[in-house]
Structures are given as structure tokens and as C-alpha cells.
Amino acid sequence: MLLEHAFGNYRDLLEAVTRHPVMGDYLSMMANQHADPQKNRFPDENYAREVMQLFSIGLYQLNQDGTPLLNNGALLPTYSQDDIENLARVFTGWHLADKSNGSWTSKQGDWFQAMAPYADKHDSDEKSRYG
């Protein structure tokens, strides 16, 4: 997967990484479901946080020269907890492409194909980004 996207664009690489079953399992996005407050179930925020912190904009705003942007000496964050919660809702409903065993919690299936979307597990409500 990395070999295929090593010299391509960032968007395609991020999509391939996001849909890869090993990444989905490692950062707990695989089998992530839409919220159900009655069952005290909420989307897992782990992958959303890593996308923001490690794979894209980082923790703090930067000047063009890479130095931290400050406000009265304080670092300025690039995103909020609300941003993470909304992005976590985007990353719901993904699982192994072959779920022929029918179990949402099982990790048996095809680990060589990109994960597939499952609409009944996805948060289909409106989402906002960055405030």
C-alpha cells in the first residue's frame, strides 16, 4: 500500500492508510459505530485524533518558518475537542470488506482488501469541522 502511494498525492495516501484494515484495527477505527446514547456508545476518537495530530495539521499552529504561532506567549491549538468528536463520527461504519460471517465484532474476513463502508453502522447525521 505504501509502495503504491509513495510518490502520489497526500489525499490518496491518507485514504489508503485510512481504509487499510491493519490501520483500522491498530487505531480502533475498524468496527467503529455511530453513537447510541441509550447504550452509552459513542464513536471512538482514537483515529480521528491521530489524523489531526500526527497525519496532518499537528497540535499547534505554526508560522511559515515552522516556529510556533503564539498568542501572549501561549501556543495556539490547531483543533478542538469538538473537531475530534465530529471527525470521529466521519470514521464510523468501516469494517473488513468480507463480513460473510455476519458478526460486526468479529475480525474474521479479508485483511488484504481495503475496509468497506457499512451504512447501518455509519453516523449519517450532519457533521461540522473546525468550529
Regions found by a protein language model. Give the residues of each.
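Active-site substrate-binding loop specific to GH73 endo-beta-N-acetylglucosaminidase modules
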Residues: 1-131
